[in-house]
Amino acid sequence: MSAALLIADSGPLIALARLQRLSLPSELFGKVWVTETVWDEVTRQPRVDELHALMAAQQVGSFLVVPDHHTALGQHGDSSADARAHLLSDPGLDPGEQSALALALATAATVLIDERRGRACAVAMQLPVLGTLGLLVRARDAGLIERVRPLVDALLASGYFLGQMLVARTLASIGE
């Protein structure tokens, strides 16, 4: 386990709730924070099994729900900060993604996010980025799960979207 901080967006939380694997992020990173906006997104209209998994994971401390971080980027004429603030205001990002990215930027944390546009913004802001598939690979490498493929198959069967090429590339890279 690393002593790093991980900021989770809603997509991976939903995926891990469907798999009943919400403990994996904290087992790998130690500290996992979820913004209030992301928490509202994942608990607003979840499937019943997802809600039970999310509530149980929060109660045992798998993650901490924290206030949204409204960063004051760009107030001091820093052009790189201005550019990062502009990325956070991308209308293609939903409020949860914006709040997760703002907190990750403010804390220099890794951001756990699946949505393509959010990942692109994180990369542009030079944040460490991890997705659900990458988290599952790390969990396998750490001996926390035996195989990735059955979990990916279960996610896809549940209706969770993962790009076919990304899945194929990821599974091929680990020999599954």
List the model feature ranges, each with a label.
Residues 2-109, 116, 125-127, 150, ...:
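Active-site-proximal, substrate-binding regions of enzyme catalytic domains
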Residues 119-176:
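Acidic, PIN/NYN-like endoribonuclease modules and their adjacent C-terminal/linker elements
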